[in-house]
Amino acid sequence: VSHVEDRAARMLTAPGAPFAVARGEDGGLFYVDGPRTLVEFVEVTWGFGDQVFLVGERSSYSYREFLAAACALARRFTEGYGLRPGDRAAMVMRNCPEWQIAFWAAQLAGLVAVPLNARWTVAELEYVLDDCQPRVLLVDGERLALVDDWRRRAGARVITFEHEGVAEGGERYEDFPAVDPRSAPPQVEVRAEDDATIFYTSGTTGRPKGAVATHLAQAGAAQHPRYHAAAAALGSGRFPGQGAAPVALMTYPFFHVAALTALYSTMSVGGTLVLMRRWDADDALALIARHRVTHFSGVPTTALDLLDAAERTGDDLATLTHFSTGGAAAPPALVTRLAARYGHRIEPRTGYGLTETSGGVLAVSGDEYRNEPAGAGAPAPAVEVRIVGVDAEPVPEGEPGELWLRGQSLIRGYWRDEAATAAAFEGGWFKTGDLATVRDGRVAIVDRIKDIVLRGGETVYCAQVEAALHDLPAVADAAVFGVPHDRLGEEVAAVVRLRPGAAVTMGELTEQLADRIAAYQVPTLLSVGDIPRNAAGKTLRGVLRSRAQGLRNG
């Protein structure tokens, strides 16, 4: 770690500096300056006026047009629908500019935005909708059929986007009156301690849990990428904020918290987001060239796909200046490959974050990342790191232990689940379940303690897939685990024990699973066999993983 980088961090966090922090009554750190709510954060973007903010396949918006549209929709929520602060607004859409209008309209109306995975099945969506009970659904035409039965039973309002027809009892966004460019937000009090978002993350019980972040937490999450960008600029001899505003390619789906980090960093400086509805490397190359994209960010799978496509087509990615990965651990070879082909022209970045931290809280970039490609970087100023052993006591520097985090951007808990909240937090510290080390203030993730599989940036919880397998009539027992995969990082594997007399093929089991869980969760390696367990009855996933790799290599 260079003295320049450490000096830059001190400059940015000194008393009176833009990212100075203080300790709150709960013991955690918070930013002294900056927004206290997402309403304060988004209202500042009015100053960017006619600069282009959102570019989609069918529509685009300047900052002025976006904010006016969000204000108009927020007033419809409060004045037309009678929604009140604290009511939930659920979004089930692929990436499009109107997704952002819906999200920020919810914030301006004091509602709690609940972004839902657009890839979920009917059963998965209905479970979560039953849990959070939204009063309004904001859906695209493709997903209306998935939620329509639920919203009829619940009596929830529905607004459809990019949809030809009109849902019975609902409204179509395209039919709303033209937006008055002078639209103002509704007169609603939004406080720092009010809930702002619920992002659902699956737990070891196999059921999704709603991670609830307050406005203060999300405002902190918005500061983290600003700090890391400023520190990176100073560390490389540049003044923060110099040059043109970024043009960023948004490959993360908006329902993932990884998208928040990319969104906040772009919005805070008046940059442009070029949206992708679904990932395709060749389409990405075309968008980068057409819109002169400067910043790429995505999960390692998409990053590798983009590099492959660029090499295959001879595209030199001439406009790119920044190349970031998140959502899953990037293979060290990725940054080595980027440097070998593009030198220092494109700055690499990566980091670490969770649903429970409202996005990225650690980051590393530039030469530090090139020299330490396995690192996850340093924490943002309002984030504290602790590495503990099995006794929950801190371990010596450099020794592995469980990573605990505390700070402004952490969630307040899980939606209506006190037991899960109590299990995940201790004295204000969130227990990540990840094994990590810290040296010189820099964190490296060693392994995962929790039984999860990171498949191409998607988090697959073994217990959730096992629960779906156990629901199948032919299955008596099941164990799910991850095995290495060259492109995806990991793929999902499962071993099942069939009920006596059951006559079913692995293909039939796969088809049955596809009706219960999202496609990325369905095991690609499925076999029948014994399931080894220890004396306590816990599955020996390491044994299963070795068996699967042996069969694949043999």
Positions of predicted regions on the chain:
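Conserved AMP-binding/adenylation subdomain of ANL enzymes
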Residues: 219-247, 255-294, 309
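Conserved AMP-binding/adenylate-forming core of the ANL superfamily
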Residues: 30-34, 50-84, 90-96, 100-104, ...
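Structural core segment of the AMP-binding/adenylate-forming
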Residues: 1-14, 108-176, 500-502
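Conserved AMP-binding A3 loop
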Residues: 62-64, 196-224
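ANL superfamily adenylate-forming
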Residues: 20-21, 145-192, 207, 219, ...
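Conserved pre-ATP/AMP-binding loop-to-beta segment of ANL
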Residues: 180-200, 206-207, 237-247
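Gly/Ser/Thr-rich phosphate-binding loop
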Residues: 268, 293-297, 309-371, 384
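AMP-binding/adenylate-forming catalytic core of the ANL superfamily
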Residues: 120, 137-139, 296, 407, ...
